[in-house]
Amino acid sequence: MTRVMDGLVIVLLGLVGWGLWRAGRAYVKLRGTRVVACPETEQPAAVELAPWQAAITAIVREPSLRLRDCSRWREIAPCQQACLGRIAEALEECVVSTILSKWYAGKVCTCCGRPVGQISRWRHQPCLMSPGMRIFEWKDIASENVPAVLRTHAPVCWRCLVAETHIS
């Protein structure tokens, strides 16, 4: 009898571990701010998914996508969340950090000419220079404005930001 119980406990622990792994994977994959064209206005909107809800549903089935926040909700009441289809189609590509990483890939600093290099969460982030020659960090940009800013601004490395802020 104890071998049967031991076997059931092992199977049960395996199922719990598998469920926790699926939940954790969904949470990590679905967190972060995304930029997507709002289906109602076709304007860029910064959205955040509800990763905990998706993680919980991922234990037993495909993660359920729901919005936790949207930059358009400040202007209009919460919507029908029609953008979720667009997000599901480009889950990784619409994450702000992915958009920025792809944009910086292969670029050189406007000030010093050094390669910007690969973007890493653990290193200093490259910056941007406006057409008016003002240098600023990513955190100074509203996420919904990232696509427009990247069309008009130039890449700047962290060293040049530090040098510029110490000179002025």
Where in this protein do the model-derived segments appear?
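Cys/His-rich microdomains that often coordinate metals
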Residues: 42-45, 74-79, 83, 87, ...
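Short cysteine/histidine-rich metal-coordination sites, predominantly Zn2+-binding motifs
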Residues: 51-62, 85-92, 98-102, 124-138
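Transmembrane-cytosolic junction motif
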Residues: 15-41
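Extracytoplasmic/periplasmic C-terminal soluble domains
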Residues: 128-168
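Short cysteine-rich clusters marking metal-coordination/redox-active sites
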Residues: 38, 67-70, 109-112, 154-160
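Acidic, Ser/Thr-rich low-complexity segments on the non-lumenal side of membrane proteins
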Residues: 37-78
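Short metal-coordination and nucleic-acid-contact micro-motifs, chiefly zinc-binding Cys/His arrays
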Residues: 31-34, 66, 102-106, 150-153
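Feature marks short, highly hydrophobic, charge-poor N-terminal signal-anchor/signal peptide-like helices
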Residues: 1-9
